[in-house]
Every structure is written in C-alpha cells, then in structure tokens.
Amino acid sequence: MPKAPKGKSAGREKKVIHPYSRKAAQITREAHKQEKKEKLKNEKALRLNLVGEKLQWFQNHLDPQKKRYSKKDACELIERYLNRFSSELEQIELHNSIRDRQGRRHCSRETVIKQTMERERQQFEGYGLEIPDILNASNLKTFREWDFDLKKLPNIKMRKICANDAIPKTCKRKTIITVDQDLGELELNDESSDSDEEMTAVA
C-alpha cells in the first residue's frame, strides 16, 4: 500500500525556546517594547481626554457677547474653572456629615478632586494655567467653532494665564517703586543711625 503523504509540518515538533537564549531575550524585548508602546498610547489618550474636558468647560462658559477677553476677564473665568468642583465637594461633605454612616463615602473621589484643585491653583498662581487663547479675537472665534473633536485640538491656540495677569501693569510698577522707596528709606535710616553712634562714641 502507498504510504500516506506527509504534510510539511508533519513530524516537525515545535522547538522549545531556552529561557536564557538570545531568542528568548529578543521575544522579551519585543514584549516590553509593545507594552511600553501601549502604555504611552493610553497615557496620550488620557491626556487628550483631560485637555478636551477642560476646553469643553471653557467653551460652555464663554460669554457669547464677547469678541475677545481681557486678561482680567480671563482670570475671572479661570477662577470659576478652579471652583468647578465646589458644589460636588459640598455634596460629598453633606453625605459624610449625615449620622449613622460608617466611614467616609466617596473618599477617593474627594481626594482626587482636592488634589486636582490644589495642583491647578498652584499653576495659576505660579507660572500660569494653560487655557485656550481667548484674548485674541481670531483664536477665540476658532475656539467657539470647535465641535469637541479631539483630532482638531492642534487647531486651537493655547496660552498660559497667571493670577498676576489680572493686575494692571501701572499697579505693578507703582508697587515696585514703593518697595524700592521703602528700601531706600531703610538704608538712609541705617546710615544715619550709624553716624549717630559714631558721634556718640567720639564724644
């Protein structure tokens, strides 16, 4: 009887890869590379979603009558943004204050909110909080027309606004001059007191 034809894979056993071989190391590197790629992809998607939520809030709270915002107006809008969780925190505190409740409910959510508010407040009072460029009329118009598509985020111009931007430049200059004058007066007073002491010692 004729022998049954053997397939190409017939008789071939899958080789077992030694854990310390170069092939195993290559597979491990590829797996780590893929994991890192997926992690970066997820982090990027998360950042885009967070930016998208922020921009959506600002767009929903724009004054339809304004063609552009002043720095003072922008700072006032940012203050509203920084306090956007206030009502939710009040509700959480209310639930936690009710008797016969064991432990604090929504503790993790409360912690996340407070950390977010603290971080954004530090940015605003420090080097600045990044928001859509609503100070420029053309950029504001583009931002108003945004349809919440995250792929169109590069079309939206951003800029950093800090708390000091709400203070007019003239007020800042006056404050600096006043401080300089005070320092000058202190130096003069110190010099006069030193000369008085010297005269007393000579006498």
From Swiss-Prot:
It holds the Pfam family Tma16. This is Translation machinery-associated protein 16. Residues 29-39 have a biased composition (Basic and acidic residues). Residues 1-39 are annotated as: Disordered. Involved in the biogenesis of the 60S ribosomal subunit in the nucleus. Associates with pre-60S ribosomal particles. Coiled coil: none annotated. It is found in: Nucleus. Belongs to the TMA16 family. It comes from the Eukaryota. The gene is TMA16. One of its GO terms (molecular function) is preribosome binding. GO terms for biological process: ribosomal large subunit biogenesis. One of its GO terms (cellular component) is nucleus. Keywords: ADP-ribosylation, Nucleus, Ribosome biogenesis. The modification ADP-ribosylserine is found at residue 9. InterPro entries: Tma16 (IPR021346), Tma16_sf (IPR038356). It comes from Homo sapiens (Human).
